[in-house]
Amino acid sequence: MTEQKRPVLTLKRKTEGETPTRSRKTIINVTTPPKWKVKKQKLAEKAAREAELTAKKAQARQALSIYLNLPSLDEAVNTLKPWWPGLFDGDTPRLLACGIRDVLLEDVAQRNIPLSHKKLRRALKAITRSESYLCAMKAGACRYDTEGYVTEHISQEEEVYAAERLDKIRRQNRIKAELQAVLDEQ
């Protein structure tokens, strides 16, 4: 039997006549910062944003605190309507007579109505400062007492005053809405 010559495997490669050349060290410029540095920068930016947001919210809360917190018009109507239905036309308040607060306070004392002076005052303020009440103040319109009887009519000066007051209240409501939006944002 003849043995066939098998190739011998070696770990060394034969060079093809080239002599190895010595190469210089290659310098690699890394333009991206390391991950820890990126993470640290992101955390610092996030902390700065949060600090700015909390400062803005605190400033908005401070600015919002100067406005009087009155009950809504519906709450004010529901507070006064059971005791003095003559002041209302359905659920809408009528124009109130001048000096009605003193009359209502005397009525509360006489009839022992469970309504504090503070609640009564706030309800009257909420009604008289509402947009629907101020819009109804036109020259010649009637003012009503607690029984629902006409006592006097609106003058031209009162109509002008109501229009100015309405502009002021709308401006304040717009500012309050902007401040509330700042407080509500995340």
From Swiss-Prot:
Pfam families: FinO_N, ProQ. It comes from the Bacteria. Keywords: Conjugation, Plasmid, Repressor, RNA-binding, Transcription, Transcription regulation. Residues 1-22 are annotated as: Disordered. GO terms for molecular function: RNA binding. Transmembrane segments: none annotated. InterPro entries: Fertility_inhibition_FinO_N, ProQ/FinO, ProQ/FinO_sf. Belongs to the FinO family. One of the components on the FinOP fertility inhibition complex, which inhibits the expression of traJ gene, which in turn regulates the expression of some 20 transfer genes. The transfer genes are responsible for the process, called conjugal transfer, in which DNA is transmitted from one bacterial host to another. RNA-binding that interacts with the traJ mRNA and its antisense RNA, finP, stabilizing finP against endonucleolytic degradation and facilitating sense-antisense RNA recognition. This is Fertility inhibition protein. It comes from Escherichia coli.
